[in-house]
């Protein structure tokens, strides 16, 4: 297709003269909020796909991508799936068991763990994250396309930082600091049970950092949006 090999950086280069500096910053930062990659590694075609699913409007993007979410977080959604399966009495599971090898004999599938234990089944569903797929030996090997994807890795290097702050007037705030700040996009997400403001801020592959490794760097990135009195910080990553 026409846009299969076009990045967002390519497309922005074509139309950048139609933007003011502030508009260019807004467009670039919103794309990176969605992809958590870089403009060069974000597919323009995939972003068109998102735009179509959001009714071809920024309002749709906000409603479908940000406004509505699980009340108790995505982890609660996964936990409820697990509990429902467990309630059937037919689920067997094992945690903290890295896989080292998967062998498909056509009649059965063998999964061998790093500790040397082998499990056999008639079929298997593989949900190993892309960025760790190369740590597992497959027999027969992965297809060339899947191997190429595993070698490239996932471009999404999302950083999500939650901050509880005292400034109540920021509970409906939205801020952008691109390209210099380590957190690109942030917005107020209501109030905490203590009555303070809850901020959610995002970074990605651009100016990537690990929030939990240096709290002072994380605080500096948060205050890169606006002065704030920070009570508490929690960070998560979605880059596996």
Indicate residue ranges for each PLM-predicted region.
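A conserved short coil-to-beta-strand element within the FAD-binding core of flavoproteins
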Residues: 92-110
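Short, surface-exposed beta-strand/loop "edge" segments at domain boundaries and coil↔beta transitions
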Residues: 40-41, 118-120, 206-213
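Glycine-centered tight beta-turn/hairpin loop motif at sheet-sheet or coil-to-beta transitions
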Residues: 114-116
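Active-site/ligand-binding neighborhood in enzyme catalytic cores
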Residues: 2-98, 137
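Short catalytic/ligand-binding loop motif for oxyanion handling, primarily in non-cytosolic enzymes
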Residues: 35-43, 77, 103, 132-136, ...
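C-terminal segments that line or cap access tunnels to active or ligand-binding sites in enzymes
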Residues: 132-240
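General small-molecule cofactor/ligand-binding pocket signal
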Residues: 92-94, 119, 234-237
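Short hydrophobic core segments
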Residues: 99, 118-133
């Amino acid at each position: 297709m026409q846009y299969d090999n076009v990045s967002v950086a390519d497309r922005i280069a074509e139309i950048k003269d139609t933007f003011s500096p502030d508009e260019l910053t807004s467009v670039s930062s919103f794309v990176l909020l969605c992809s958590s990659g870089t403009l060069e590694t974000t597919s323009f075609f995939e972003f068109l796909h998102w735009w179509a699913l959001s009714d071809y409007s920024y309002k749709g993007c906000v409603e479908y991508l940000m406004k509505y979410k699980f009340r108790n977080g995505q982890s609660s959604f996964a936990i409820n799936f697990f509990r429902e399966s467990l309630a059937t009495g037919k689920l067997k599971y094992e945690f903290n068991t890295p896989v080292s090898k998967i062998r498909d004999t056509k009649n059965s599938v063998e999964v061998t763990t790093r500790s040397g234990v082998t499990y056999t089944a008639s079929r298997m569903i593989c949900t190993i994250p892309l960025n760790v797929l190369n740590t597992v030996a497959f027999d027969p090997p992965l297809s060339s396309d899947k191997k190429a994807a595993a070698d490239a890795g996932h471009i999404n290097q999302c950083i999500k930082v939650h901050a509880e702050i005292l400034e109540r007037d920021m509970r409906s705030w939205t801020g952008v600091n691109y390209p210099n700040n380590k957190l690109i996009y942030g917005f107020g997400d209501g109030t905490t049970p203590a009555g303070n403001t809850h901020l959610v801020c995002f970074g990605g592959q651009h100016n990537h950092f690990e929030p939990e490794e240096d709290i002072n760097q994380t605080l500096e990135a948060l205050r890169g949006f606006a002065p704030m009195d920070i009570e508490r910080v929690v960070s998560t990553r979605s880059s596996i």
